[in-house]
């Protein structure tokens, strides 16, 4: 039956509308006059604001302040500017502060009974009170006449558009070939269509108000906040949309006052190596005003301000702790979130928008954060908007207004106190104990909302109907009237803009443009960022030192490689090589400046810090080019010192001329080259959006720079189509300058005169530039003849280099400023082609899909309120959960203790915890932040890899066996999945490998379909997991995580770690109720839960509550309406829990959770002595006794499935290899990137060395072309390792602990899958390089051998990459090691320094380098038996003695077996002798022989086999052995107790014998 268009209920009381109208009118007409200048706030227990009354008026509900508005609109004080007053008074107690007009502020002046010197005003004291501090701050600021900006915001007809569709298709390796058959997509038709994200929003937020933004994920909350702050980045507003700040348009406001409206994103971006104190002091310093109270210095002001915010947000103890990230150890996740909050607070912006900033915070901390926002709004007039997903009633009551979003449509905007009544009068039912915020969000969820009886056909259903109802409501009319008054009060661009400019100008430093949004000048910004750069370097000094040491080691190696180079013509090639090495290593060491993978772990890397710079630019901390310039300034001294040490070593050890003048020229050019290449790499990083883009371009650029330096390919041999690269190559100019600098003015003794017995003018030196009859060769003549270089070019080249340097630095600064933002797009699902569900629509009617509304008289549809609690027998999608196999096993743990050692100091994480989980029960694991909830879960699930665990863990009274982990499910907090797999494939993979082999594949897949129905995943079962924003959303990922564990059919129990983390209230409700259904069907469930609402909390049967230090506070039943739990706490001295209070929040408050929470009662000690604790021990004894008897009765016939894995090795290998093949096939960017790298590099090399002639230089160039092919090796390795890490992370974090498959299978599968693609790559490189370079004249045998070598080389590269990354933690570390090893292999392969010229202690490196055999085999096959035809400058030209022919004169030389060839034997003058006659003679100088081709090929395969075995061995030794095995655990226990020997002895001596280890309690049974 079609529903009627919803209308506002005409028969409903309109008292709320009258009250709202009177509030708006009162607020507008009763505004204070400019004469008053005091803003008073007095504590009260009645109401938070005289305009809005609340149902809950206790302290915890946030109703704690009454506002008397007597401030002046022109002089409302700033919230965070008074801190310096207290620091001055505390440090100089005898100095009375003076005001701007010279008057004194008496030290005994008080405000509401608070003295300035009170410890409650000192953020370093435990008595500090932010509320009182802020009030006194206001008072002093008013006295000194310092103003701050304040403004509200009004938005009318706000519509935001984005690009993207609700669904896209997954690309595969063949997608580019299929594109021509889809012309619509190829031409852009139907691709990235315009999508309306926000529809026609209206509202007004006055200064000092708090707005709560509610909506489900994807409803547009983040976009709304970004629109308010003007941070849309790629999204667009409609022309009709209006946003203004007290009359100032958003365009003008963002241009001149950008930092006055800031947006706090949900993700945290900080420099991990900075401490919390450094991070916040930087933020404070960047926004420190020019006019400060008492004239304090900027440093004192910013330091004190940072201390205040650290105290407010509970960060004082982390002042000297690194912020950290996923890779760098630092503060906890919750503390890092608070750092982000404090950073925003320090910006001093009058408009702040917070996007789910309470995520990851426990309820007590989230409440304190919201209270701090309220104080800021009331005292400082800050306008704040906060999007929040799980808000308690106490948090909700703090807000002034609320906006509710439904699929991008506004369905309510108004005071928080009338919102609930509005929706109830609409016809929706709010269950008891459901918070108002949850209720408001639930009405947007068809699966959760409940219609009142009699309203079933009157309530709106779709988002459009809700919006229509809102626009026709009286509340909307009052809102529009209030907006009209707002606009009348603040006419566009009249007056208020000048006031804002005036106040902003007062805060600006000298030499800052008046219309600049920044408070400090550019030089101050550069200085501040430079100091921060050095702080980051110091914080990561180990990495900096390691990098510098590696560079110095390379200098020592290269220098020693050319040690004692002869000062003869035989040393010409060596001199060119060492200078080539020096200039390349100096220039290319800066490539690390485009590394870091956007994690900000590299101290001065542009791309790594981009998200942080973008954030700070939006906060108006500094210009992006200021940070870029600071990076340059900070980097120059470090580069100078490193270059000095590096070049001293390589210059003097490498045999270059020991002349002070030449050394300083050498150093000058190398240092300028370092800076120039640094500027180029920085520009490349700044101009690209992602690290892979930058690295891909850098790889191509480096190849071009190396080839066209002038050494590997001499200028005269360059082809015109690429020769232009020589003229834009900075390294080429530096190489020419260094080479001519070295040989200028020198003469070198001829090492090979032709003939050696010649005299007078009857001989010549077989070197370019030689003069007949001279026994030495001029260095200037040699470089001019060989390279066309001239000493006259040296200073010209310096000028060109400086020009390059200035140009690229300028471009870098410009690009850094302009290329910051990234485009935003709408979220979408990704499906495999041909697998889109038939009923899937991009914008479907969720109401219809959910089967209509819910009714309050249907018990099966009501949220359960009892502890038995199933909400009927249907899962979220209505399917049964009866497929869960029944369970009978009881898991118990007793006196579990977990100790680890940190920096040599022991630390106890879990302290004698006991409990159990029965089948059919849902047990909650809760605790304060840092209590060890996840740690306990990991310990119970046998997933810890370090430390010592003691205690008893039993299943049915028996010790855990090797099958325990595969018989349990563990839902991790992080939703880790392979991004290329579909939902159904992920579930089938889990079922295939984790269900017993006795179950057929058909049965497994049928069970997977049951799981899909249980979790209501039918609509996206064929969707690809993808990445956030391009794939499954947060809720769908969490469902998949749970589904993967259910698909394994856990026989014992199901562990869950924070299954509701990051979800909105309705999604959390869906997850927890599903767990309730699982428990009701016999599943044993143990779940940690972070911030449960009262209704969610009542779904659990039992609770294990932990305090800090992993100590038990409570373990037992929760009881109906939480009576058992509450009775325990109240019996032992806690305040009674209010009837409307959330028991979960009550518990946290009782034990003193939150940054400033304290409890007078030691609850863990109370528990230890309680009757309930003794009952737990008795019950454990009883359970163990009963299960032991039952085990004895069954004897050895009890059901048991021994074995670590459910499936045999071959089945594991088949499944895993198939999945890895699938992953590669569905990652076309990786495969095509690999193939294009090989194709473009090989073609570029081939056409650079196109058809080289048979001269000696031509042969050398041909050898260099083969050498250049091997340089692809490094880029290939860098591509492979991140792919391996992705697979390994998933395996080690989820699949190995679950015992899905063996680590040996994981390694073999990854090795196997790479091989076909490496074979294809070898074929492409072979065809692209060797045909252009050597032509098609080679025999088929030789071409076949070349192909085999190419394929072998690329297979070696893949196995080498896997060997290096196998045991290392991340791709960055492995990349550094691989690059170093590759450098050694390339250096010692006999091309750049002939083997016979190597110092004796380095010859072994030539023999062990794998590249030696690859180059040897390729070169021998390519150049064997090739006739040498010397170029004119390569010939030894001389006259024979009078009367003799050339042949007669050289007869002795020929008879002695000289390798050369005489071109004019019958001539009597100008004999032309070529030193070589065949390619084999040329190769022989590098000890490359045609006869060794198959030996070299065999050695190559030996290296591949070695790589594979080494991969397995390294992975086992580093990543398997250390984390598994009983002997290692025993060793850990012994080591731990030995480390505690001194402690035990001291305790014994002092009589504290209880500290000594007791056999049972402290050692226990080792697992």
From Swiss-Prot:
The chain crosses the membrane at residues 543-563, 571-591, 636-656, 661-681, 691-711, 798-818, 1231-1251, 1257-1277, 1305-1325, 1345-1365, 1372-1392, 1498-1518. GO terms for cellular component: plasma membrane. Induction: Expression is induced upon exposure to itraconazole. Residues 1-11 have a biased composition (Pro residues). Pfam families: ABC2_membrane, ABC2_membrane_7, ABC_tran, ABC_trans_N, PDR_CDR. It catalyses: voriconazole(in) + ATP + H2O = voriconazole(out) + ADP + phosphate + H(+); fluconazole(in) + ATP + H2O = fluconazole(out) + ADP + phosphate + H(+); (R)-miconazole(in) + ATP + H2O = (R)-miconazole(out) + ADP + phosphate + H(+); (S)-miconazole(in) + ATP + H2O = (S)-miconazole(out) + ADP + phosphate + H(+). Glycans are attached at residues 149, 157, 356, 819, 895, 912, 1253. GO terms for molecular function: ABC-type transporter activity; ATP binding; ATP hydrolysis activity. It is found in: Cell membrane. InterPro entries: AAA+_ATPase (IPR003593), ABC2_TM (IPR013525), ABC_trans_N (IPR029481), ABC_transporter-like_ATP-bd (IPR003439), ABC_transporter-like_CS (IPR017871), ABCG_dom (IPR043926), ABCG_PDR_1 (IPR034001), ABCG_PDR_2 (IPR034003). SMART domains: AAA (SM00382). SUPFAM superfamilies: P-loop containing nucleoside triphosphate hydrolases. ATP binds at residues 927-934. It is a multi-pass membrane protein. Keywords: ATP-binding, Cell membrane, Glycoprotein, Membrane, Nucleotide-binding, Repeat, Transmembrane, Transmembrane helix, Transport. PROSITE patterns: ABC_TRANSPORTER_1 (PS00211), ABC_TRANSPORTER_2 (PS50893). Residues 1-37, 1172-1202 are annotated as: Disordered. Residues 167-432, 891-1134 form the ABC transporter domain. The keyword Nucleotidyltransferase does not apply. Residues 22-32 have a biased composition (Polar residues). Its main location: membrane. Pleiotropic ABC efflux transporter that may be involved in the modulation susceptibility to a wide range of unrelated cytotoxic compounds. Belongs to the ABC transporter superfamily. ABCG family. PDR (TC 3.A.1.205) subfamily. This is ABC multidrug transporter MDR1. The gene is MDR1.
């Amino acid at each position: 039956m079609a529903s009627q268009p919803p209308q506002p209920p005409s028969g409903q009381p309109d008292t709320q509308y009258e009250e709202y109208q009177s509030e708006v009118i009162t607020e507008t007409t009763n505004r204070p006059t400019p004469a008053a200048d005091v803003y008073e706030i007095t504590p009260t227990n009645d109401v938070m604001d005289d305009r809005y009354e609340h149902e809950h008026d206790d302290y915890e509900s946030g109703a704690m302040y009454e506002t008397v508005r007597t401030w002046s609109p022109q002089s409302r004080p700033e919230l965070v500017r008074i801190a310096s007053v207290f620091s001055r008074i505390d440090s100089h107690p005898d100095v009375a502060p003076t005001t701007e007009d010279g008057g004194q502020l008496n030290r005994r002046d008080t405000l509401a009974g608070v003295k300035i010197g009170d410890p409650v005003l000192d953020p370093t004291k435990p008595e500090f009170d932010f509320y009182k501090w802020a009030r006194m701050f206001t008072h002093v600021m008013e006295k000194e006449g310092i103003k701050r900006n304040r403004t509200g915001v009004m938005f009318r007809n706000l519509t935001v558009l984005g690009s993207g569709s609700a669904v896209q298709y997954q690309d595969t390796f063949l997608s580019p070939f299929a594109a021509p058959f889809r012309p619509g997509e190829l031409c852009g038709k139907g691709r990235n269509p315009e999508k309306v994200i926000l529809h026609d929003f209206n509202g007004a937020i006055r200064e000092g108000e708090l707005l709560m933004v509610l909506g489900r994920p994807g409803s547009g909350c983040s976009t709304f906040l970004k629109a308010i702050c003007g941070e849309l980045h790629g999204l667009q507003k409609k022309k009709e949309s209006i946003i203004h700040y007290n009359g100032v348009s958003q365009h003008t406001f963002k241009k001149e006052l950008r930092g006055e409206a800031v947006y706090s994103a949900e993700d945290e971006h900080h420099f991990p190596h900075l401490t919390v104190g450094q991070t916040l002091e930087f933020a404070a310093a960047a926004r420190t005003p020019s006019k400060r109270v008492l004239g304090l210095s900027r440093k004192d002001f910013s330091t004190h301000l940072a201390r205040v915010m650290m105290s407010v947000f509970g960060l004082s103890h982390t002042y000297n702790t690194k912020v950290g990230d996923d890779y760098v150890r630092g503060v906890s996740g919750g503390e890092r979130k608070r750092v982000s909050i404090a950073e925003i607070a320090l910006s001093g912006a009058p408009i702040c928008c917070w996007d789910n900033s309470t995520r990851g915070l426990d309820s007590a901390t989230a409440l304190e954060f919201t209270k701090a926002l309220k104080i800021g709004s009331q005292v400082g007039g800050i306008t704040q908007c906060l999007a929040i997903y799980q808000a308690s009633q106490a948090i909700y009551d703090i807000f002034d207004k609320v906006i509710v979003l439904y699929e991008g449509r506004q369905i309510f905007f108004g005071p928080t106190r009338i919102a609930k009544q509005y929706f109830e009068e609409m016809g929706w039912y709010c269950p008891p104990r459901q918070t108002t915020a949850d209720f408001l969000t639930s009405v947007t969820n068809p699966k959760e909302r409940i219609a009142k009886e009699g309203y079933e056909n009157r309530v709106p259903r779709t988002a459009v109907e809700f919006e229509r109802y809102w626009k026709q409501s009286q509340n909307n009319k009052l809102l529009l009237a209030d907006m009209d008054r707002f606009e009348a009060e603040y006419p566009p661009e009249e007056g208020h803009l000048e006031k804002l400019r005036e106040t902003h100008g007062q805060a600006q430093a000298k030499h800052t443009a008046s219309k600049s949004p920044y408070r400090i000048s550019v030089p101050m910004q550069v200085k501040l960022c430079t100091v921060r750069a050095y702080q980051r370097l110091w914080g990561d000094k180990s990495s900096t030192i390691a990098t510098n040491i590696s560079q110095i080691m390379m200098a020592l190696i290269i220098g020693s490689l050319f040690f004692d180079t002869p000062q003869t013509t035989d040393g010409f090639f060596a001199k060119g090589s060492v200078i080539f090495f020096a200039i390349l290593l100096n220039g290319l060491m800066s490539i690390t400046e485009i590394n870091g993978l956007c994690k900000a772990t590299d101290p001065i890397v542009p791309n790594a810090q981009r998200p942080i710079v973008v954030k700070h630019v939006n906060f108006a901390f500094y210009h992006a080019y200021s940070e870029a310039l600071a990076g340059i300034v900070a980097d120059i001294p470090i580069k100078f010192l490193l270059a000095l040490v590096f070049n001293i070593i390589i210059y003097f050890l490498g045999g270059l001329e020991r002349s002070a003048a030449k050394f300083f020229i050498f150093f000058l050019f190398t240092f300028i080259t370092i800076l120039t290449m640094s500027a180029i790499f920085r520009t490349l990083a700044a101009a690209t959006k992602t690290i892979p883009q930058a690295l891909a371009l850098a790889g191509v650029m480096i190849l071009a720079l190396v080839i066209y330096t002038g050494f590997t390919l001499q200028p005269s041999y360059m082809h015109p189509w690429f020769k232009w690269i020589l003229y834009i190559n900075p390294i080429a100019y530096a190489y020419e300058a260094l080479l001519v600098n070295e040989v200028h003015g020198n003469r070198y003794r001829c090492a090979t005169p032709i003939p050696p017995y010649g005299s007078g003018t009857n001989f010549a030196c077989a070197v370019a530039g030689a003069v007949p009859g001279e026994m030495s060769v001029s260095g200037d003549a040699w470089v001019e003849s060989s390279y066309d270089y001239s000493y006259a070019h040296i200073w010209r080249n310096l000028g060109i280099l400086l020009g390059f340097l200035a140009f690229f630095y300028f471009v870098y600064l410009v690009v850094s400023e302009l290329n910051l933002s990234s485009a935003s797009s709408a979220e979408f699902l990704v499906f495999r082609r041909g697998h889109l569900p038939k009923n899937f629509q991009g914008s479907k009617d969720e109401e219809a899909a959910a089967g209509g509304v819910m009714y309050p008289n249907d018990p099966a549809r009501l949220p359960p309120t009892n502890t038995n609690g199933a909400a009927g027998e249907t899962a979220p999608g209505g399917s049964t959960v009866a497929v869960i196999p029944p369970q009978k096993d009881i898991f118990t743990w007793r006196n579990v203790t977990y100790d680890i050692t940190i920096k040599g100091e022991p630390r106890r994480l879990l302290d004698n915890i006991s409990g159990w989980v029965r089948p059919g029960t849902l047990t909650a694991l809760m605790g304060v932040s840092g209590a060890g909830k996840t740690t306990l879960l990991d310990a119970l699930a046998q997933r810890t890899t370090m430390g010592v665990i003691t205690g008893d863990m039993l299943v049915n009274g028996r010790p855990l066996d090797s099958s325990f982990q595969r018989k349990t499910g563990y839902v991790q907090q992080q939703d880790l999945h392979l991004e290329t797999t579909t939902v159904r494939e992920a579930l089938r993979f889990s079922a295939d490998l984790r269900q017993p082999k006795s179950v057929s594949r058909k049965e497994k897949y049928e069970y997977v379909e049951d799981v899909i129905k249980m979790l209501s995943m039918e609509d996206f079962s064929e969707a690809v997991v993808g990445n956030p924003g391009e794939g499954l959303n947060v809720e769908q990922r969490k469902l998949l995580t749970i589904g993967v564990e259910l698909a394994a059919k856990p026989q014992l129990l199901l562990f869950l770690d924070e299954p509701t983390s990051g979800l909105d209230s309705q999604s959390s409700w869906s997850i927890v109720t599903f767990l309730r259904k699982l428990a009701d069907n016999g599943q044993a469930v143990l779940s940690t839960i972070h911030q449960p609402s009262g209704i969610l909390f009542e779904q659990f049967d039992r609770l294990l509550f932990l305090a800090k230090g992993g100590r038990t506070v409570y373990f037992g039943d929760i009881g109906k309406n939480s009576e058992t739990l509450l009775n325990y706490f109240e019996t032992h001295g806690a305040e009674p829990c209010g009837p409307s209070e959330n028991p979960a929040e009550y518990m946290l408050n009782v034990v003193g959770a939150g940054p400033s929470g304290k409890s007078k009662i030691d609850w863990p000690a109370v528990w230890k002595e309680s009757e309930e604790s003794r009952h737990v021990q008795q019950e454990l004894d009883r359970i163990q006794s009963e299960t032991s008897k039952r085990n004895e009765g069954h004897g050895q016939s009890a059901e048991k499935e021994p074995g670590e894995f459910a499936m045999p090795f071959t089945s594991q290998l088949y499944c895993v290899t198939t999945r890895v093949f699938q992953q590669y096939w569905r990652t076309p960017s990786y495969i095509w990137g690999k193939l294009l790298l090989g194709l473009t590099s090989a073609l570029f090399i081939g056409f650079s060395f196109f058809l080289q002639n048979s001269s000696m230089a031509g042969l050398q160039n041909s050898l260099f072309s083969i050498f250049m092919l091997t340089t692809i090796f490094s880029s290939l390795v860098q591509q492979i390792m991140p792919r391996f890490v992705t697979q390994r992370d998933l395996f080690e974090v989820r699949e190995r602990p679950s015992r899905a498959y063996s680590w040996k299978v994981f390694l073999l599968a990854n090795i196997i899958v790479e091989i076909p693609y490496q074979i294809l790559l070898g074929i492409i490189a072979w065809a692209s390089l060797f045909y252009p370079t050597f032509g098609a004249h080679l025999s088929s045998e030789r071409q076949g051998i070349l192909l085999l070598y190419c394929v072998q080389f690329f297979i070696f590269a893949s196995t080498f990459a896997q060997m290096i990354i196998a045991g290392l933690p991340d791709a960055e570390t492995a990349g550094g090691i691989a690059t170093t090893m590759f450098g050694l292999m390339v250096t010692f392969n006999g091309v750049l320094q002939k083997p016979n010229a190597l110092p004796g202690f380095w010859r072994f490196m030539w023999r062990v380098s794998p590249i030696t055999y690859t180059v040897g085999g390729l070169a021998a096959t390519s150049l064997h038996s090739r006739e040498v035809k010397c170029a004119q400058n390569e010939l030894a030209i001389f006259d024979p003695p009078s009367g003799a022919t050339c042949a007669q004169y050289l007869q002795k030389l020929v008879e002695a077996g000289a390798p050369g060839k005489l071109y004019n034997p019958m001539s009597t003058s100008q004999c032309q002798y070529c030193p070589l006659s065949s390619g084999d003679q040329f190769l022989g100088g590098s000890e490359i022989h045609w006869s060794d081709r198959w030996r070299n090929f065999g050695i190559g395969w030996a290296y591949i086999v070695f790589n594979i075995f080494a991969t397995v061995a390294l992975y086992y030794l580093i990543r398997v052995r250390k984390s598994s095995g009983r002997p290692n655990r025993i060793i850990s226990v012994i080591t731990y107790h030995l480390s505690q020997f001194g402690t035990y002895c001291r305790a014994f001596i002092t009589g504290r014998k209880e500290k000594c280890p007791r056999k049972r309690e402290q050692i226990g049974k080792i697992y």
